[in-house]
């Protein structure tokens, strides 16, 4: 892992080929915040070999593998549920996942008409090498972002599954909790799931107005105006100077326009 400030200003001469950068003599055509990606070489360098009996001892062995189109890595036991992985190893595995995610995004935003299919193939390969139930993603927000990539590639249910998994975690921030509800409400229009999520948060943190506001929004979008009005009236009983709540109550309590 190389921090941007440790690249000594040679970003435009770096090329990602797997888990390492290669320093090249060729400058990138476009200046970006990240070094360019050698897609084909990277695919080979992070894919598991299909022949465990063919070992790489010498440089020519490596090039024979490359020229034959074979994968290089041997991800031994990283999908074995009987092996214990401590927190440090779990964090290191995120570096492996990062390479797969870069390739997935490259496909997703490319002009290739099969880009989404290729993205799903790469993500499924990643899940096969490092199953989520064996080596969990240590960062809850990264877990959600992986789900969002699945959704963009055509598998929205994978995002929902990951949201449900993240909701069970004890280490997620309140900002992430808020974000989860917004995804249910705005991306899936699953107002029942959003309401259930925000009701739990509001019960646990009744003093945080943002959870009240988002729960009111979810009630309103689900056409449960009476619940939204009741919640606002209850809140204003102890927070009479909350101008935003007053404004929302005046709107939601007014008769519907025919």
Language-model-detected regions and their locations in the chain:
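ER/secretory pathway lumenal C-terminal domains and tails of membrane proteins involved
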Residues: 1-152, 158-165, 171, 200
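Alpha-solenoid helical repeat scaffolds
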Residues: 101-102, 136-145, 174-179, 209-217, ...
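Residue-level signature for tetratricopeptide repeat
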Residues: 106, 149, 183-184, 218, ...
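Structural motif corresponding to the intra-repeat A-B loop/turn of tetratricopeptide repeats
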Residues: 110, 153, 187-188, 222, ...
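Structural marker of alpha-solenoid helical repeat scaffolds
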Residues: 129, 169, 204-205, 238
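Terminal, low-structured helical/coil segments at or just beyond the last alpha-helical repeat
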Residues: 221-258
């Amino acid at each position: 892992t190389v921090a941007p400030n440790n690249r000594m200003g040679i970003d435009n001469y770096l090329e990602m080929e797997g888990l390492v950068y290669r320093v090249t003599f060729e400058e990138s055509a476009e200046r970006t915040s990240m070094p360019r990606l050698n897609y084909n070489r990277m695919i080979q360098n992070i894919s598991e070999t299909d022949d465990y009996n063919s070992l790489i001892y010498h440089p020519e062995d490596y090039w024979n593998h490359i020229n034959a189109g074979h994968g290089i890595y041997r991800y031994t036991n990283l999908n074995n549920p009987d092996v214990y992985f401590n927190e440090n190893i779990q964090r290191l595995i995120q570096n492996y996942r990062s390479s797969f995610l870069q390739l997935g995004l490259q496909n997703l935003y490319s002009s290739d008409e099969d880009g989404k299919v290729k993205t799903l193939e790469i993500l499924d390969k990643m899940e096969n090498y490092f199953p989520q139930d064996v080596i969990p993603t240590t960062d809850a927000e990264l877990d959600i972002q992986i789900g969002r990539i699945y959704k963009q590639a055509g598998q929205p249910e994978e995002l929902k599954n990951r949201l449900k998994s993240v909701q069970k975690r004890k280490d997620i921030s309140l900002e992430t909790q808020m974000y989860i509800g917004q995804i249910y409400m705005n991306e899936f229009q699953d107002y029942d799931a959003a309401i259930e999520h925000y009701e739990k948060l509001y019960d646990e943190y009744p003093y945080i107005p943002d959870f009240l506001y988002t729960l009111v929004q979810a009630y309103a979008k689900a056409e449960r105006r009476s619940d939204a009005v009741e919640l606002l009236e209850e809140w204003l009983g102890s927070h009479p100077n909350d101008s935003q709540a007053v404004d929302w109550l005046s709107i939601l309590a007014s008769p519907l326009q025919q």
